[in-house]
């Protein structure tokens, strides 16, 4: 089950990069919440931000992944370096991203996506502190 969540998360980064809002709209729960460096908001605003290109998640380099499954909830931590275009400017930031997935009707849906800015980028080749990667 952990591998299924890891694949879904990785696919999600690609869909965000591709601005594939149709697939993302289906993945994000109606009551999903998103936390960014600039604020927090719900599904509709996140989808519109991606669709309109206000934030273009250009490339997420995933360094470490940890997944914990609790009943019908999966909590995934990604340590990433994100290349994004914000307001026409390309920026690169190290983040710990928390993704919460909830199993509904036989499939996993995203309930929350939170970006925590890290003070320093991950060292190349570092091993995760535990979990699955």
Regions found by a protein language model. Name each.
Residues 1-133:
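A beta-strand edge to alpha-helix "cap/lid" segment located at domain peripheries
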